[in-house]
Amino acid sequence: MRALRVSQALVRSFSSSTRSHLENRVAEKQKLFQADNDLPVHLKGGGMDNVLYRLTMTLTLGGTAYCLYCLGWASFPHKK
């Protein structure tokens, strides 16, 4: 019985909480990303998007190069 009361209290506290502190910024983001300013869409978010893009490309290219190196190393016979 006690577990039922606890679960009801948890459900009530999560379901009835107000979200007035969060404002809807979808319209602002739509204006930003739909603006015709000759920027690629992955860079329209600002400087942090640029850093994230460069980091992602660096890790991708580094991983590809390392994978090719390991495949090349494994394809040649080794001395015993």
UniProtKB/Swiss-Prot annotation:
GO cellular component labels: mitochondrial inner membrane; mitochondrion; respiratory chain complex IV
Q: Name one Pfam family in it.
A: COX7a
Spell out where the chain crosses the membrane: 47-75
Transit peptide, residue positions per record: 1-21
Q: Does the keyword Membrane apply?
A: yes
Q: Where in the cell is it found?
A: Mitochondrion inner membrane
Alphabetized UniProt keyword annotations: Membrane, Mitochondrion, Mitochondrion inner membrane, Oxidoreductase, Transit peptide, Transmembrane, Transmembrane helix
Q: Which residues lie on this side of the membrane: Mitochondrial matrix?
A: 22-46
Q: Which CDD domains match?
A: Cyt_c_Oxidase_VIIa (cd00928)
Q: In which pathway does it act?
A: Energy metabolism; oxidative phosphorylation
Q: Which SUPFAM superfamilies match?
A: Mitochondrial cytochrome c oxidase subunit VIIa
What Gene Ontology terms for biological process does this UniProt record contain? mitochondrial electron transport, cytochrome c to oxygen; mitochondrial respirasome assembly; oxidative phosphorylation; proton transmembrane transport
- Knockout: what is the outcome? Mice are viable but show reduced cytochrome c oxidase activity and develop dilated cardiomyopathy and impaired skeletal muscle function. The cardiac myopathy appears at 6 weeks of age; it however improves and stabilizes by 6 months of age, due to incorporation of Cox7a2 paralog into the cardiac cytochrome c oxidase holoenzyme. Defects in skeletal muscles are characterized by reduced muscle bioenergetics and hindlimb capillarity.
> What Gene3D superfamilies does its record include?
Cytochrome c oxidase, subunit VIIa
Identify the InterPro entries for this entry: COX7a, Cyt_c_oxidase_su7a_sf, Cytc_oxidase_su7a_met
Domain of life per record: Eukaryota
The way it spans or sits in the membrane comes to: Single-pass membrane protein
What drives induction of this protein's expression? Induced in brown adipose tissue in response to cold.
Mitochondrial intermembrane compartment spans: 76-80
Q: In the record, what terms sit under GO molecular function? A: oxidoreductase activity
Family, per entry? Belongs to the cytochrome c oxidase VIIa family.
What is the stated purpose of this protein? Answer: Component of the mitochondrial respiratory complex IV (CIV, also named cytochrome c oxidase complex), the last enzyme in the mitochondrial electron transport chain which drives oxidative phosphorylation. The CIV complex is the component of the respiratory chain that catalyzes the reduction of oxygen to water. Acts as an assembly factor that specifically drives the homodimerization of CIV complexes, mediating the formation of mitochondrial respiratory supercomplexes (respirasomes) containing two CIV: supercomplxes with two molecules of CIV show improved activity.
Task: Give the record's subunit note.
Answer: Component of the complex IV (CIV, cytochrome c oxidase), a multisubunit enzyme composed of 14 subunits. The complex is composed of a catalytic core of 3 subunits MT-CO1, MT-CO2 and MT-CO3, encoded in the mitochondrial DNA, and 11 supernumerary subunits COX4I, COX5A, COX5B, COX6A, COX6B, COX6C, COX7A, COX7B, COX7C, COX8 and NDUFA4, which are encoded in the nuclear genome.
* Listed name of the protein: Cytochrome c oxidase subunit 7A1, mitochondrial
Q: Which organism is it from?
A: Mus musculus (Mouse)
The gene that this protein is the product of is: Cox7a1
